[in-house]
């Protein structure tokens, strides 16, 4: 969808195409504001079609395989209520680049990715920083992301928070 920022991602990739030699950008998700054809046309127009693979929606094991086999998950979103895809990515130990449209400021505290302003330039800098981050440090970022999700969003923790909220209201 347009609020997911796929256009911003593609523009950022186009700006630094030479620095991303050997990298593949996989765009997954159900069609909404953009169709697979429109995304492929955008990649052609930006001269990045050789490094962009638009796969459409992924479900079940295919979705989890994509998260777990990715080096980084990028979501330059306009706004998210939560951003379940960020949590899912972290559960696979994959670091995240997302924008401040997602309520994930704790990314900075946990040092498990990049939480940036939603601009092409900011995304460009974050991608470059990611590419230049040593593999072991990226792996540790992903593990810290997994720890973040387990500490903040495990079902028993969320249930306790709901009970506390309920008790504070009555």
Tell me what each language-model feature is.
Residues 24-38, 56:
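Glycosyltransferase donor-sugar binding loop
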């Amino acid at each position: 969808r347009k609020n997911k920022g796929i256009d911003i991602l593609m523009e950022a990739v186009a700006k630094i195409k030479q620095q991303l030699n050997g990298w593949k950008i996989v765009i997954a998700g159900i069609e909404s504001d953009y169709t697979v054809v429109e995304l492929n046309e955008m990649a052609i127009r930006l001269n990045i079609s050789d490094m962009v693979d638009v796969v459409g929606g992924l479900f079940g094991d295919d979705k989890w395989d994509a998260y777990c086999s990715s080096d980084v998950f990028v979501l330059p979103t306009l706004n998210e209520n939560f951003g379940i895809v960020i949590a899912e990515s972290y559960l696979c130990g994959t670091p995240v680049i997302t924008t401040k449209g997602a309520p994930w400021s704790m990314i900075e505290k946990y040092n498990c990715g990049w939480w940036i302003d939603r601009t092409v330039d900011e995304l460009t800098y974050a991608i470059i920083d990611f590419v230049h981050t040593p593999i072991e440090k990226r792996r540790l970022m992903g593990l810290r992301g997994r720890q973040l999700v387990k500490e903040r969003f495990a079902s028993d923790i969320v249930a306790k928070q709901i009970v506390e909220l309920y008790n504070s209201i009555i």
